[in-house]
């Protein structure tokens, strides 16, 4: 499947380019991007035809990419829906737990932080025309031209002036704005004056010194060049050291003279000498400063002593002496042997830069130290200067001298039509190609940092070094080797020169025709088209591990051309899509200024690819945000975002770009706010594409992050209300984004009652997320709640104090009750009513009621999250608790005189809870499957509570099974547990009573405020249907009186989400021991936890000391993780690399799996025709911990058996050889056990899903090894009944529906038993099915390809449900024939999936078709069975018994065999059978016993040693 972005264009031939110029000083010598659309006259007809052909090719190439990303996603979804083996829990959030990779790609230093200009140029010409230097013997004829002018044709002085002007004009073509100064046949003083003047004016910018020494001797071996002194001698040396001093830094030198390499050598030597002097000078200064400090300290002491003794005069004399000594030390500096003694001072006066950077100066020399300049009369004498300043002219002349072309003269070469700046002319095209070729050579040869310095830092320097590459090629042919500093690798034989020669050849071959007929058509070179094709070929086969594409700089140059621009952008986008390494390369080559200026283009055909390119750039380097704001680039993306007709993928990428612009960038936030980004994002929150919704939310979150003005604008737009609607979105990423955005709205409400009310309402609204199936969403919830805690810290500290005090009092009461029970030996668990009454009536702990205020409710939610089954969630919540707990002193609490109180009274131990009644805050609405919100004011009422009601919405919390005290205790028990180290904890035999609160009415009167929370007729319907009662929380406009501690608030909740919140608050209040009535059995739960008050105090202190604690506020990394999506390939085909190891392994596994399925079909047919006569024992092994075996699961294709024991340990075995592969802990809460276990994904990646008595469903991946083991997800199956280790839900039964990714769970819940369906793709509870009986579900099974599933009950009922039917009507049929506990049910594929096979504990096995009211077949096993299994495809049934026997029979009830003994001569009797299971395909059966023995039996074996007939 090709998952790609659409970069096709329906009108490429008419695509318009940029009409705006690009002034870019940091581009490779190109000042602007011009289209010149109006210049397509008759002279360019051939160009137009070529362009049209190129556009057609572009269209053909681009159309090969998939139509749109949206279509690709639809295709992927279609393929997934039609793939019956689609893996689950394979999303990115499951692979990395929504945590960004800490090993981020290192961003290359592509941005030139020290960008500079060459602002001054000194042209020093020592020609002495008419007089040859004495040390050079010239040939005859020899080269005479200087700057393409023969000086012998003019008088010497006039020729000298003309050469100077011509050289200046040649330089001005490369840098027209520089300040040029000529010094013709100068003296030393003139050179000095010139250099100091230019340096003074240039300040910190670069100065160029061009030296032509053709009329003077060669440089000396002492580091000197020659100038003139007319007063004494003809030639006088000028030290390079002095020249360095006058020029300062930064500077660039061009030396065009014989033996110029000597100058380079001495220049570097002097630079090193200067560095050593500067280091010595700095060291002296340091020593002097230290001496000054010591002397100053000593003087101060002496002053103090002398002032005491009256010896002032002596001290003053000493100070004077010290001052004189310091002055003499500071003035003592060393000067070099060659140069002025004031060189350091001169350098400082001439340059503000440090002389230590002399080695960083750039030098270009015409030849090496032992070479002389070429004297070929066909070329100018200053060939090196010609190469540097007129590269095209000298290149054409050199090419003709080496070409077989005839009829081309030098005069013809000088008359090539066009100009250098017009790319549509022959001369301009040659210059354009030359720039691309030299850039490409430099890019592929030079190190990246050197390329950046020489080709991207300075416009003039870049031009000179491009031309220097040509000089190396031309002058080497004349046995002359140019030298540069920094030294470059050899480039004169690079392959790109051949492409340059071809382009030159094509132009010169047309030259006679073009000169003869000015109207002749010029045939453009196919150079760029061919290079783009080469780049495209590289994209097809290249990768990060291969050499980067050589044509990348050419792609950059092609962006200047309208004809090639679209194709170049598409190819560039494909290259950037390869990964962050490709983006780094593109930025280093200089792509940034080009694509930045392209944002000013109105061309619609460039929009999609420009958005994609910018998304790739910003995914790597966020620092580009300021550049975008500065160039008004954000407006481009806002315009894309504001057009609903633009494809979703482009709007998604635009939202990402805008979010990056706003990320920690106040100018970006302000610009986007002014640009009306907020209403645009809000208008698209209901977009059908979840990626659009997600990034619209994150874009808004980043816009108002720490930006109060944007927060107020969001509140005015009711953004918080609209975001609340998305808390139940079907996409977990959208829900997490909504939580992040709402969390970012929190904070900064100081002094604003309206904002305070809104923030508290938002925090209460977020409570519904605690029931979310996705750990990613719950993690973001904790972080958002931490912002509330930070904003209202004092209120939460007060709540925490009161809860801690209450727990101490409760521990005292418990100790007293235990003491009395030991004395009386009559009551072991019933508390004294009088004590409880006194606790309620006389303790000032309940007088202020702050625990049941808004802050109290939120604090209890946080405490509940401390025991979240997912570590990342629990750890963050625990850090909040630790931070708040550290704010108050435990010793102070323990010193309170609360323990010695008497006259306790339990008559009215009712929880108190203040709600929220806020003006200007808000309320929530749940209607027709959507969670609605209206945050204009709230009076939350609770009545006729319903569970559910939103489309995929989460289930309301009702945490009535755990006290806050138990929460504190369990925090320390669940932290830092290693899931790979199985524990040996034994299952406790006693369970605490399960608390129920669903029918309790909580009445609280606090400070005159009444709270009503009525739980009447909980109606849990089908969440996915519109039959639900519409839910709302009505706003009565009541005002909140927030006095800082949360008192004097009122909550009234209606049904729907309001009911969910009410249930949450009520249950949290109950779970903290603050709610309920005399029937509340909280004391029983407490008594089962501890036997003394001291243990409670120790537990609480242990929590404060053991939890990780960070003073800083929790930080969400969800945004950074979300950004990773754009760093990964987005338009690449998802087709397999058939040569990779992974592809070969996958192909092998696919063939193996098909073979296993085929062999199993044959085996099933054989069994149908001739049932097996025995099941021979294949393997036997034992669990080392000695625990009973509770569950067995065969892997469908690998020789793996997954085993769980009677506690919380899971082991993985190779059943072929009986070797244990791995063992790990399920991370249950203490005292609970694994109650169900299934395998998820028949094909890779296989995972284990477990359910335990603690009410938690866990998903494990990589279970074959501890190195790969990871908890993918975990959630509470019934979050409204959150449990601790002492009050488990009971047997939590789980079934996995692999075709649709549904998890069916049921258990012994406090209220009416139900079956809940969770959708693992959406990670939401989607349906509650009421079973219509008070008995408990013991087992479940589903048809593999349909909506039906069956459930067995503890009272013998078997019911068939249709998940398409909502609520209490889901049960479509009931079998009442069983009279005892249902051990297991099955809906085997061998019976079409429509027949239910059930087995009861008395041994009855019934076959039941749902279209009938009674069973069609009954098999009487005549034995009590403890385990029961049916083969999925073969007509085989296995029954295990506590009587140490396994019976295997067919569907007609005929016994196949009975297993009583293990194999062997002295076969031991098998233990009491606790579980049996068939292999999904093969005729294999596994059996586990209470003696920890596991046996594997093969139905194809002919052995009879273990068979009892």
From Swiss-Prot:
Keywords per UniProt: Repeat, WD repeat
| InterPro entries in alphabetical order | ARM-like, ARM-type_fold, HEAT, Raptor, Raptor_N, WD40/YVTN_repeat-like_dom_sf, WD40_repeat_dom_sf, WD40_rpt
Q: Which family does it belong to?
A: Belongs to the WD repeat RAPTOR family.
Subunit structure of this chain's protein: Part of a complex, TORC1, consisting of tor, raptor and lst8.
Note one Pfam family from the annotation: WD40
Q: Where is the composition biased (Basic and acidic residues)?
A: 89-98
Q: Which GO terms describe its molecular function?
A: protein-macromolecule adaptor activity
The cross-references to SUPFAM superfamilies, in alphabetical order and at most eight, read: ARM repeat, WD40 repeat-like
One GO BP: TOR signaling
* UniProt entry tagged with the keyword Repeat: yes
Task: Specify the protein name.
Answer: Protein raptor homolog
Compositionally biased residues, Low complexity:
20-67, 282-356, 1082-1091
Q: Which PANTHER family match?
A: REGULATORY-ASSOCIATED PROTEIN OF MTOR (PTHR12848:SF16)
Which organism does this record belong to? Dictyostelium discoideum (Social amoeba)
Q: Where is this region: Disordered?
A: 1-100, 281-356, 970-1005, 1018-1058, 1072-1091
Residues in WD repeats: 1184-1225, 1229-1270, 1284-1328, 1332-1371, 1377-1418, 1420-1460, 1468-1507
What do the Gene Ontology cellular component annotations say? autophagosome; cytoplasm; TORC1 complex
**Would the keyword Nucleotide-binding be found if you checked this record's keyword annotation?**
no
Q: Where is the composition biased (Polar residues)?
A: 1-19, 982-1004
